[in-house]
């Protein structure tokens, strides 16, 4: 009984915040992700390893959307669900083991974009013989709007967590800081990190471009009090930014 209580407490410690957790996550993805995170901890896996596994599963899911076979398509859908489980488990493992890294944040940010690029591309190729060039216009429009929506949802979520949990409980970054990190390293010395930071830099710029008021608010607050926010400000802005 005591062990179950400890396990339950540990599970809840891997969640971000009740304000930002979606119903399907709480009932499905988080519990399964927690089991995967426990397995990863036992096997000494890093959160980035689980993220990479999710990327592979997501790409495979897209490839299985290409054949006109319901059986293969259903397998592809199952792989997409497993990729989503990995997307949950990597963050849970990071919070469980306190294994945070900029590279992990970058990989986590672009992983779902890579899956859906694979899915959109393979679906477009599947329907091209019947739809012709029009399928590409539809696919590009859907992919771009999807990417922007996902980036905005992530930004609003992290912005809210910044005021509710503080800097340590949020993954909110700004493009200037990311750009500084990007320029501080050479491609020759750290090619993977350099390339990852380039993508993440532009990802944060897109977020700030579509949310200029939030960016200005954070800059003003930083000029006044740095990253340490007063309880009053945290409560007011946290309430105003509820999802």
Descriptions of predicted regions:
Residues 8-17, 34-44, 70-73, 96-104, ...:
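Short juxtamembrane and helix-loop transition motifs at transmembrane-helix boundaries
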Residues 93-102, 154-164:
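A cytosolic-side transmembrane-helix exit/cap motif
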Residues 1-32, 158-243:
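C-terminal membrane-associated helical module and adjoining short loops/tails
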Residues 124, 128-159:
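Alpha-helical transmembrane segments
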Residues 47-103, 120, 137-144:
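Membrane-embedded alpha-helical segments that form the functional core of polytopic membrane enzymes
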Residues 47-52, 108-116, 235-243:
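Select subsegments of transmembrane alpha-helices in polytopic membrane proteins
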Residues 56, 60, 107-122, 166-177:
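Small-residue-rich segments of transmembrane alpha-helices in multi-pass membrane proteins
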Residues 91-133:
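Basic, amphipathic juxtamembrane/active-site segments
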């Amino acid at each position: 009984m005591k062990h179950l209580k400890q396990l339950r407490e540990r599970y809840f410690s891997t969640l971000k915040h009740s304000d930002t957790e979606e119903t399907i996550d709480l009932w499905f993805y988080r519990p399964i992700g927690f089991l995967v995170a426990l397995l990863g901890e036992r096997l000494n896996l890093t959160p980035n390893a689980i993220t990479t596994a999710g990327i592979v599963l997501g790409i495979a899911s897209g490839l299985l959307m290409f054949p006109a076979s319901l059986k293969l398509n259903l397998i592809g859908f199952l792989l997409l669900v497993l990729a989503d489980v990995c997307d949950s488990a990597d963050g849970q493992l990071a919070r469980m083991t306190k294994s945070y890294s900029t590279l992990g944040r970058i990989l986590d940010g672009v992983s779902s974009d890579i899956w859906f690029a694979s899915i959109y591309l393979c679906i477009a190729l599947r329907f091209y013989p019947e739809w012709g060039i029009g399928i590409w216009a539809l696919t590009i429009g859907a992919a771009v709007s999807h990417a922007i929506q996902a980036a905005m949802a992530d930004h609003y979520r992290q912005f809210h967590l910044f005021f509710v949990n503080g800097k340590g409980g949020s993954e909110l970054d700004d493009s200037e800081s990311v750009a500084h990190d990007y320029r501080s390293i050479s491609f020759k010395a750290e090619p993977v990190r350099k390339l990852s930071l380039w993508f993440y830099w532009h990802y944060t710029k897109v977020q700030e471009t579509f949310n200029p008021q939030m960016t200005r608010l954070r800059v003003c607050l930083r000029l006044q009090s740095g990253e340490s926010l007063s309880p009053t400000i945290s409560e007011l802005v946290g309430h105003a930014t509820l999802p």
